[in-house]
Amino acid sequence: MPMQQRMEKWFEAWKLLMHDMEKQGAQVWPLTIEPPAAMEEIESREESLGISFPATIRTILLLGSSQVQINWSLPSRTLDPFSLSGDLGWSLDAFEWPYFGGDEESENEKRYLCFHVGGNGDMLLIDLATGVDDPPVYSWGHETDEFLLLGKSFTEFVERVTELGCIGAECWNYEALAGADGLDVEGQVAQEWKEWLQIYRTLTFEEAAQDFEKLVLFAKMHGAGDSRIQEAFTQYDWEPILQKWVTQIEQETASSNLLLWCQLIVETVGKKAESWVRSLWESGPHYQRLGSSQRAYLTAACLPEEEGLQRVLAEMDEVVARKECLVGYAANSHLHHFHSREVILWMEPHVAYPIEGWDELFAVSRPRWEDLIRWLDGNEAQRQIALSAWGKMLTSGESPSGEANWQEINRLLDVAYEKAILRKEKERVDRIRSSLETVKH
């Protein structure tokens, strides 16, 4: 196939890929396909590098595009079994001699020419040592200092990476798909990835709503926070739906995905899962698969509020009884889903520095003005937590409930400012004061 025709095929494939990914809710960055470079520009770059580009690279820059950039990433709710993202590019100005670290110049730093750098510093390189018109492409990992063959030629690399959805450019994207001859587009992993990606690009909600298995797959890819998706699940019995997600939890190997499966249970089964959630509080395989914070999330969502809250508070009390350090982040991860003022009353004797986590928990636990006043008049940690939490509430347009005693609040703000030692503590008070008129009205 003539090179110009081949490049036009690439351009069309990239445009369609980005269109499909954006339509399905993936995060995409503007596709860049710049006009070809002028011969004078190419020769100027060659002169600055001290080499002549291989013939194929010259042709691509001269007849195809002087700069290409393709970037996409899947939404955080997507349960992608491969955890890949898209990053492919080159530009005339990006061709540069690589630096592989170390005090002395490596001979490899004149063997390879970098044409693209991934977000983490990994590089895509062409190998000049072969002396061929269409040089091999390698990925270099900045952490491992290892080279991975991606294609025996530049055009072969672009063909194959395009077929794989322009994955890259951090080297871990390629590792499961690389073979002895570069990216293996026919291997089992590649076939599974291409099939998954094609379904992601084309499966619509309207199609998924007509078939249970497709609906399950759609929810895996997009989550089920959308009310349309939740409504579609109501046409099916809840037991098979719950079993689908429980089975996935049992089979999951990535701990970072466990919360996503729990969210699907909450969104598609909800309180009907209460018996299963209660079983998590018994010694059994489900609890061994899930962490205590994930169990707390399910408990808050699926059990009656009082029952669920008391279970989690009892667990937190056990942590305190064991004299383990209860930090704000841990308390927040277990209790913020309840949005209960009772949490504020529970946490009052337990809070300490650092305040991070505690302040977020206070803010989301529906405080009353009397709670805020009590904490502003409390110990130093309570005061700083209350100020930080109040600031977070003001930022989100919220305020405590009940009647505000502004005279007492202003007095306590004055005290807080006088007792503040760090600049950031004084700044907290200043931000509160600057917002008071808005709150009062």
Give residue ranges: language-model regions:
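Long, contiguous interaction/recruitment modules in multidomain scaffold/adaptor proteins
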Residues: 118, 127-205
